[in-house]
């Protein structure tokens, strides 16, 4: 397992240094982008990728504990003024509101897994158990059409509207 995780490190480093090239600059955009990928991919690597991009957008590194505190809004304004960033090109300033990026990524990486059977491991397991008990379950796309789009997507849109649209 460790070998597989270690292969993502160069990609995470690249994202930190090239985050502005993605065109995702606001917490609301991170919410939808992270969520869209978390619907179909494992949420842990998706979370790490977007977290690295958010840190890189601010010129920070996920590996640095002081940078983590800065993004979580745990540093005083005086400490923020002395914060050393990785690069200076198109860097968004770190503010006491920068934690909204982490919040948007965290929330969407978790909740969007319910959009598909494969978005979260237990979803597929529950489907299989139900089918073994002779409970009729919708197909992959049937689930999305009957439940994800009409029920979950409006809820996620409301979450975005309330918490992330203004940023």
Question: Where are the regions that the model predicts?
Answer:
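Juxtamembrane/interfacial segments around transmembrane helices
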Residues: 41-46, 51, 79-81, 152-165
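Alpha-helical transmembrane segments of multi-pass membrane proteins
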Residues: 25-36, 62-112
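Transmembrane helix-loop boundary segments of multi-pass membrane transporters
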Residues: 15-21, 109, 164-167
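Transmembrane helical segments that form the transport core of multi-pass membrane transport proteins
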Residues: 1-61
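Juxtamembrane and boundary regions of transmembrane helices in multi-pass small-molecule transporters
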Residues: 111-167
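Transmembrane helix-bundle signature of multi-pass membrane transporters/permeases
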Residues: 32-40, 53, 106-113, 143-149
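Re-entrant/interfacial helical elements at transmembrane boundaries that shape
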Residues: 13-14, 45-58, 65-70, 120-132
């Amino acid at each position: 397992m460790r070998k597989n995780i270690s292969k993502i490190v160069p990609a995470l480093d690249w994202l930190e240094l090239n985050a502005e090239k993605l065109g995702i600059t606001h917490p609301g955009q991170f919410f939808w982008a992270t969520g869209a990928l978390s619907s179909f991919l494992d949420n842990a690597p998706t979370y790490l990728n977007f977290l690295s991009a958010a840190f890189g957008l601010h010129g920070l590194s996920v590996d640095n504990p002081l940078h983590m505190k800065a993004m979580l809004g745990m540093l005083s304004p005086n400490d923020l003024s002395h914060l050393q960033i990785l690069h200076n090109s198109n860097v968004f300033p770190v503010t006491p509101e920068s934690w909204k990026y982490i919040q948007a990524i965290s929330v969407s990486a978790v909740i969007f897994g319910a959009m598909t059977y494969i978005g979260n491991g237990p979803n597929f397991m529950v489907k299989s158990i139900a089918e073994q008990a002779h409970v009729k379950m919708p197909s992959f796309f049937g689930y999305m059409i009957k439940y994800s789009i009409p029920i979950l997507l409006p809820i996620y849109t409301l979450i975005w509207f309330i918490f992330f649209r203004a940023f």
